[in-house]
Amino acid sequence: MEFCLAQPCPQGNHEATSSTFNTFQPMNLTQGRCQNLSCGSRPSMQVMKEQGVQLSPRTNHTVVSASAPGTAWVLGNADRAEEVPGKGDLSLQAETRAWVQKTQAHWLLLKTAPLWFHGFITRREAERLLQPQPLGCYLVRFSESAVTFVLSYRSQTCCRHFLLAQLGDGRHVVLGEDSAHAQLQDLLEHYTECPLSPYGEILTQPLARQTAEPAGLSLRADSDSGSKRQDPDTQLSLLLQQGQAQASGHTEKVWASQQKATSQASRPRPPIPAKPQLPPEVYTSPASRLHQAPPINPIYQEPDEPIAFYAMGRGSPGDAPSNIYAEVEGPSGTAPIGHPILRKCWSRPISRGQVREVQGKISSRSRAERGSPS
């Protein structure tokens, strides 16, 4: 069903005037072009209803309100319907998602969405994407005013938007056309060869989206939610499996923690190494080491008889500066024993003066003995 613009827009609504393209043409061009192109007979709205065209309540409301008094949309041809610009509120998107899960899940949710399907994009966004593209470039999106698909394509003078209806047997048609197809892909390929009436324009190439999934439609999440809603037993079994998995995981964690604690408790601890015992001299100060007490037991034995002074050098340290001695031999080659002049020496050093005095006496006596006759 086609609506032609009699006035720019409804009073107070400035959304339609800011479109990138003018998507409507004069009413008198419609029938002429269609007759020249021999597009064939097109079923009217009454015929479409008899064939079971599925239109949502929002679509029916749009068609009825278009002919209401005082509206900007004037019913020019009851055989075609272009999309009425809408706000695309959240409630409409929710209804559209529910409709997709109910009727389109077999090809849209369970498979990869075609690249020409852009999801929830606005009319302005579609026109912005199609403006730099060549003639006949097209895309499919969700409608902003009805729960259905919209075919948007680039024409020579503007960007056109046509509603796509679905018959009772599941086939898709351009609303107002008589060519029905089981798949949207087949419908689009058909109009790459057969022109769309009444403008006589054909589709050339699809406009691929730049995202992995259609805008506003997560295929995996929606398919999962749809399958759960349709099969409550499956959903319950999944919940039970998740609960069992969580319980088993918790039990395994508790068992592992208990095993770890038991192994740590049964494992013998290594002995603590004892500190090395150092002699007490290590902890004494250097000052105390210099003044150590002499040993109680001497390291030498006292002689039974006194040792002569000249024998003090034997066995005594040679580095003592005050230990000066001289060995003197007697006439018979042996040292005199028990000389009356010598004093007893108890292993104590004598002074230099005593040594000189003794040496002088010995030398004078020896000279006297040599000089006297024997």
Curated annotation (Swiss-Prot):
Originating organism: Mus musculus (Mouse)
Compartment(s) of residence: Cytoplasm; Cell membrane
A cellular-component GO term for this protein: cytoplasm
Single biological process term from Gene Ontology: T cell proliferation
Protein name in the entry: SH2 domain-containing protein 2A
MF (Gene Ontology): SH3 domain binding
Gene name linked to the record: Sh2d2a
Subunit text: Interacts with KDR. Interacts with p56-LCK, TXK and ITK.
Skewed-composition ranges (Basic and acidic residues): 221-232
Tissue expression remark: Expression limited to tissues of the immune system and, in particular, activated T-cells and natural killer cells. Expressed in the thymus, lymph node, and to a lesser extent, in the spleen and bone marrow. According to PubMed:10553045, also expressed in the lung.
Free-text description of this protein's post-translational modifications in UniProt: Phosphorylated on tyrosine residues upon TCR-stimulation.
Anything else known: Proliferation of SH2D2A-deficient T-cells in response to T-cell receptor (TCR)-mediated activation is significantly impaired. These activated T-cells are defective in the production of interleukin (IL)-2 and interferon gamma, but not IL-4.
Function: Could be a T-cell-specific adapter protein involved in the control of T-cell activation. May play a role in p56-LCK-mediated T-cell signaling. Could be involved in the regulation of responses to T-cell activation stimuli, specifically proliferation and lymphokine production. Interactions with ITK and TXK may provide important biochemical links of these two important kinases with other components in the T-cell activation machinery.
SMART domains documented for this protein: SH2
Annotated ranges, domain SH2: 116-207
Region ranges (Disordered): 213-232, 241-301, 321-340, 353-374
PANTHER family: SH2 DOMAIN-CONTAINING PROTEIN 2A, T CELL-SPECIFIC ADAPTER PROTEIN TSAD
Keywords carried by this UniProt record: Cell membrane, Cytoplasm, Membrane, Phosphoprotein, SH2 domain, SH3-binding
Polar residues: bias regions: 256-266
Stimuli inducing this protein: Up-regulated substantially after T-cell activation.
UniProt motif (SH3-binding) ranges: 267-273
